[in-house]
């Protein structure tokens, strides 16, 4: 016997450690002829198992383990597919089990599918006779070798295999302990069965009967199923009048061409070209299906992106409304999307606003039917850090040890335990004791195994037939899922479309809706001008916080250097600012500002590269060059581009000669041809799809346009989308303030869960207030909408439900200013809390009873809290300051010291900052130094205090204190940081500065005020302070007089003139 008929692979989640690759390797070495995959209830591993078997020339048998029941008794049963129909029966049976969450399978279910299946009962006892008899007369019925001897039936040796070798036995109890969230010692007591994958030699020692061997061989011969890949499973689109899909598609396209007045012959020729390729490849239904669901979205208040990926290079997509990018206008190539010389399924990914994406999926489900639409499964795996913690937990490691393990494994994508073991600290932990060594060995054996299923973020499978005819299904959090991954589902021919949720589309849509509602202005984003100077000024200033694709510090720096003037500049920046092409940014910017420096290898390259100043940025440019120079068709050019990006030497050499020969036939010099080939080879590795860049740059431009023209609504919606992130909220509020937009405290009668734009400014969200959850906010808003605005603090306290009314909620709302609208100081309202909490809750809900039985309430008026305390409470309850940041306030008061801010300071100038975080570390030499995070009320920046300076300041610096710092600015990891050389407490710096001052300059002051007459001194006095007036308009300095250098005179100057107009020198 050279077949194993009962293998549980690692896709039997947390019930097997048998990896398919390792299984097949061992089976091939041992000489196995056939293997049967029999995971319990699921078929997750079928494609991988099938492919590995075929590659190893091993006969794959498809099966499944189920627990069959008659309602009284349950028996473990293995079912195997005899043929392709049997394989489909397994798809349907597994789908039914998983969709209905059945752990035991009724006899009737199996009888429905058993015609093309082989049934093998395991460890059958007399009590199972009724179950077995239900299949009486079935020819392909077997009992495994250790079933009860008194039962009649054909016998076959069948022992489940769940791990590879005997020394892997401990993996099963470990997996079960992880699955059951229990300790390994408790599981070990129950696990006694030997379930390793045996060698052929071990099988021979079993002395199996001839009947068992004959029956095993019979089963192997009977099972002849295979997975059918690359089937034509595209659903058919139902046309309105029974037309063929081809005719209906052409009718729509011609109508749109005329309707949109695209009368240029080039459009008609391009359309004919694309239409022929699409219909020749049989994809007309695909385009109609995608067009239909996008049409639904656009007519049902769901915003759709302008395009994504290479599909924006298609005129057919544009005319069908799938994209809003005219490919001829932007010189985009259809063959980059759909290549007739490399037949693959088209791949149109669609961006929907993320808050309404489910609406479109629901439409598709309703249109095609419940079992005709599904998501796609993905698998979470036991990766290094996760498996190390899981195994540590089941082995009884305490939390301290588990945290130590997490810290010892480097935070590196894809790191393995073996790689972590190379670190001395990790190795020392492993060998600290025997328990740790065992932990490490078990962890390594489980590392990488699939742990759980999840749902692919975007992929949706659509068919006009039930999907379980082609692949098994299961359920996930969002509904049905294929049991096979995205690539596996696509490989068998199923239509997959990515429905992606894009937050920025939700922001754009909300701005449009709110502007319409509040200002009665209809914003048509397809009609906005793409030469708006205000937009390009915004981009040139780098004011792109919140702008899709353009908000990182690095991109903002590039925009400032580039000074964009055209939409093409945005397209170039979004394409260049990526690893690889980033090194070409400086070249691009230099040439952009100095077009005369651009040189081309050959004049024929100029029309292709002129827009990018001789720099190859886009994949389409490579294709255009190959077509122009070597005479390649666009299909051939796309194949060349792909070959170049994959760096396959053999293919590259072949393509190189192909290119040079083609160029020679076109009359190009051989040396020039080689240089051009090498040029495109250099850029092919990171060339960006221009169609995608144009599409996403359009979103970036739209957001920039809205930011410029509707800033209140822009910031309100951006802020609403970062609720929960203090850092992002604080940064965005900071920027809004600097744009002179008023940030208003939460208002109990105006604010919502989201931020609200108004003609006064932006009301903060009630959701930003710490200690107030969503449900409380919802109840407050619901009550206000149902019964009108709150009249005063007492009215609010009476109307909100008792279950949410407490001191913490009321204090939070008061201290952030939510009740300021009622005209009482926050101190007064704090004093009133005890009154409202003492109200008789039994009568609160009845307004008449309340008025009759409750004494009239009144406020005990209190003077307002100090400004600093109000600011501190704002920071405490919101995470940021509504009013000016304390550092900004201090800066305004202390400008006479000649201090600067981080944003406008330069090397070794005094800068006023607050330290938000201080991280002290020890260097390799054992010296202390510190990394600090500073802010000046507007800008945040990292700072470094090296050991030689830190020893001087170590005891005097603390978090959330203000200092004057001097140092040198340096760029590190694309971010500016300050190397701090000197540090002063503000008062100490001021004392030193004033004491050493020899003169004072007063801006735009022509004479001293009378109060300084008594302070004047003669010019020869030692302690004289010279006073000068500076006339800005005339750029002229005038001596105004001298006063004594005394503190009281300094204070008098500061009180008399604005701090911004005084400079002590």
From Swiss-Prot:
Single Gene Ontology MF annotation: nucleic acid binding
InterPro entries: DNA_pol3_alpha_NTPase_dom, DNA_pol3_alpha_thumb_dom, DNA_pol3_finger, DnaE2/DnaE/PolC, DNAPol_HHH, NA-bd_OB_tRNA, PHP_dom, Pol/His_phosphatase_N
GO CC terms: cytoplasm
UniProt KW keywords: Cytoplasm, DNA replication, DNA-directed DNA polymerase, Nucleotidyltransferase, Transferase
Catalysed reaction equations from the record: DNA(n) + a 2'-deoxyribonucleoside 5'-triphosphate = DNA(n+1) + diphosphate
Family designation: Belongs to the DNA polymerase type-C family. DnaE subfamily.
Protein name: DNA polymerase III subunit alpha
Domain of life from the UniProt record: Bacteria
Known function: DNA polymerase III is a complex, multichain enzyme responsible for most of the replicative synthesis in bacteria. This DNA polymerase also exhibits 3' to 5' exonuclease activity. The alpha chain is the DNA polymerase.
Any one GO biological process: DNA replication
